[in-house]
From Swiss-Prot:
Transmembrane stretches, start-end: 72-92, 157-174, 187-207, 230-250, 272-292, 330-347, 360-380, 385-405
Mitochondrial intermembrane side of membrane: 93-156, 208-229, 293-329, 381-384
UniProt KW Transferase keyword: no
Classification via InterPro entries: COX15/CtaA_fam, HemeA_Synthase_type2, Peptidase_S1_PA
Function field: Catalyzes the second reaction in the biosynthesis of heme A, a prosthetic group of mitochondrial cytochrome c oxidase (CcO). Heme A is synthesized from heme B by two sequential enzymatic reactions catalyzed by heme O synthase (HOS) and heme A synthase (HAS). HAS catalyzes the conversion of heme O to heme A by two successive hydroxylations of the methyl group at C8, in a reaction that involves matrix ferredoxin and ferredoxin reductase.
Bilayer topology annotation: Multi-pass membrane protein
Species assigned in the record: Mus musculus
EC identifiers of the protein: 1.17.99.9
Gene: Cox15
Name of the protein: Heme A synthase COX15
Binding of heme o, residues: 155, 229
Amino acid sequence: MQRLLLPSLRALTGSRNVGLLVPRVASRTQCGSSCGSQRPLRPGQYSTITEVALQSGKGTVSLPSRAAERAVGRWLLVCSGTVAGAVILGGVTRLTESGLSMVDWHLIKEMKPPTSQEEWEAEFQKYQQFPEFKILNHDMTLAEFKFIWYMEYSHRMWGRAVGLAYILPAAYFWRKGWLNRGMKGRVLALCGLVCFQGLLGWYMVKSGLEEKPESYDIPRVSQYRLAAHLGSALVLYCASLWTSLSLLLPQHKLPETRQLLWLRRFAGGTAGLVFLTALSGAFVAGLDAGLVYNSFPKMGESWIPEDLLTFSPVLKNVFENPTMVQFDHRLLGVTSVTAITVLYFLSRRIPLPRRTKMAAVTLLALAYAQVALGISTLLMYVPTPLAATHQSGSLALLSGALWLMNELRRVPK
């Protein structure tokens, strides 16, 4: 029996030493004639700590805990990549002003695009009933409409693919028993956040389809809803990436010194600053604030422009005044790169593993590359390819910050 089972177990676990995981059996000489036949010991008495048990009733095999962790970690790493793709594609959709081309939302029905001329004409006529066509695109042709429609369609279909990438493997791993209690709660939260993200996306689009006389006759989605949509996507990305790194990368046993404690806290604060800077970019995009002052380092002829606080009450300027929004994004960007530079030099004063040092160097390089992209995007009046690259850079920078934080995390006792 053992000869029959070992090849299957080795194929599943990818280990040549699977034979060590088969339970010992009591011999007839140890238990006497009363045993009758050989009986396996209890599951807790396996010859190694990690258990591999055949469940003959269900026909499934439980992988060793480490192998299961790596499988779940790889899955979540792929999921974080799909979320990054959705964020980038959503940014391009916004930059090409395509987000309001699909004026309704159906989970299943809209998965089939128009195919005939009549269907396209009907879709175009629906779009013509809304402010964006009436005010901005009244001379748009059907061919131009097809382009922006397919941009929004691609973003929505990608979002559905992200949902499937989370939910289907989660159900599979859950059924196989490869998720412990803590991981089950985390996976449920991630899947719930994916569903919430889809609903939030439509809630955002609806704000751009409404008549808004106070919006200076420029149809656009609410910058608040845009920031919420991007923010929830970033939270989903960060949670997925952090969990995957924690499962895939061996944890360092670092000496718990005061210097390391301060470095760990500073790295966490820096990551939070990078997240806030990326989130502020949603307000820049929502208000087209990148086109207000296209000079650097000054804003026009001054360091602090005169129209910085023109709205009343004053707090309204932070979220609705394009000048203030651009000023805040600049300030957050400069503060972030300064904090990352300080973090890098602090890390050089502490003996750290090679992989941790590599994470610090990578984060520093990503920070200066992102600053260069941001300045170039500003000076060139926000061209779509460069602006999309700048948004992608924010994800890369956030990933670098999370990687370094993960390298410095405390080993549980």
